[in-house]
């Protein structure tokens, strides 16, 4: 019964057809991509991963990039943060999957066409704000814990 198979109805039921007629198997798209790029190996020695998407909302926890990246980072004890275009209803649900914080590119009231016209500028501004926050966090860590920034790659056990 294909009605109970997660993902079988995606792409107009293409997954179901492949499973039934070609003995195919289903695998999460983001998991496939992360495997193809050897993501877990690339996390070795990494302190923080920056990911993102255009609009983060309740749907973001259903097999999208941020969820997959967050899950893998969390499994390796690595901080994951995100730059997103906008945050909608349920956006903070992504925090349960390893994304620790997110910042929007939108820095004021604007229409979608305005945001798209200034996408590069808005993205760079968000990236600057994000890395300033990370730097502030590192300084705070040094002040509170005496952790030298040169030792940041060492993880507490």
Across the structure, where does each feature detected by a protein language model lie?
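N-terminal loops that bind phosphate or other acidic moieties
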Residues: 1-157
């Amino acid at each position: 019964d294909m009605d109970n198979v997660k993902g079988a109805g995606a792409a107009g039921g293409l997954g179901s057809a492949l499973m039934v007629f070609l003995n195919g198997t289903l695998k999460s798209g983001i998991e496939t991509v992360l495997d193809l790029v050897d993501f877990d190996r690339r996390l070795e020695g990494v302190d923080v991963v920056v990911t993102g998407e255009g609009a983060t909302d309740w749907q973001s926890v259903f097999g999208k990039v941020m969820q997959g990246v967050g899950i893998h980072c969390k499994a390796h004890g690595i901080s994951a943060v995100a730059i997103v275009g906008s945050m909608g209803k349920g956006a903070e649900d992504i925090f349960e999957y390893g994304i620790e914080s997110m910042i929007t590119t939108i820095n004021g009231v604007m229409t979608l066409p305005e945001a798209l016209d200034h996408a590069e500028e808005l993205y760079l501004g968000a990236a600057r704000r994000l890395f300033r926050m990370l730097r502030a966090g590192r300084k705070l860590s040094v002040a509170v814990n005496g952790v030298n920034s040169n030792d940041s790659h060492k993880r507490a056990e």
